[in-house]
C-alpha cells in the first residue's frame, strides 16, 4: 500500500516500469493500464462429484457478518455450504486443497472487501472450473464472461430463486473468452 499513491506511482513510472492493475477504479484514478485478473488453466483433472452446493474459503477481512448472513440464507434455502474461514493465513488450507474443495462444489462464493471493485481470483476460478458464482461485486456485469445464468449478484438479484440458480446447470462460456483470463495471455501483454 502506498502512502501517497500518485507520487509513489509517478516515481515508479520514472524508473521505466509499466504499471497495471486489475481494479478499473484504480486504473482510472491513477492512470494505470487496466488488465484482467488472470488464472492458469487447470493442468490436472480434479474430482467431478459434488459434495456441497456453495463454497467459500478465505479470511474474514471485515466480511464476517456478510458471510454469516449469506451462509444462513443459503442453508435456510436447503443448500449445503462449505465455508472455510480461518483466523489467520497460517491456519488456512493449501491452494491445491482449496482448488480440490472448490471442484467439489456447485457454486463459488465471492464477497469483496469494501471499496474493492476489481475481480478477485474467485470469479476466474469459477470460470475455469465451470462453477456458478455468487458475488457482491456489481461491477462483474461489465466483464465479457458475465451471464446471469452463471453469476448471481448478492444484494442485487432476488433471493427467491437462489436455490434454483445454484442447482441449475452452468452455461458454458466460449473458450475464446476464457483465454482472455489465462496467465499466458496476460504474459503476452507484457512481452515486446
Predicted regions and their residues:
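Hydrophobic beta-strand segments of well-ordered beta-sheets in folded domains
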Residues: 16-20, 52-55, 78-83, 107-108, ...
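Conserved beta-strand termini and adjacent loop/short-helix elements that scaffold enzyme active sites
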Residues: 22, 35-37, 84-86, 154-156
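Catalytic donor nucleotide-activated moiety binding site of glycosyltransferases and closely related
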Residues: 58-99, 138
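Catalytic binding pocket for nucleotide-activated donors in carbohydrate/polymer assembly enzymes
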Residues: 96-192
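A generic structural motif
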Residues: 1-3, 81-88, 155, 177
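Acidic-and-aromatic substrate-binding clefts and catalytic sites of carbohydrate-active enzymes
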Residues: 3-5, 89-92, 116-119
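Residue-level detector of flexible, active-site-proximal loop/helix-junction positions
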Residues: 26, 39, 61, 88, ...
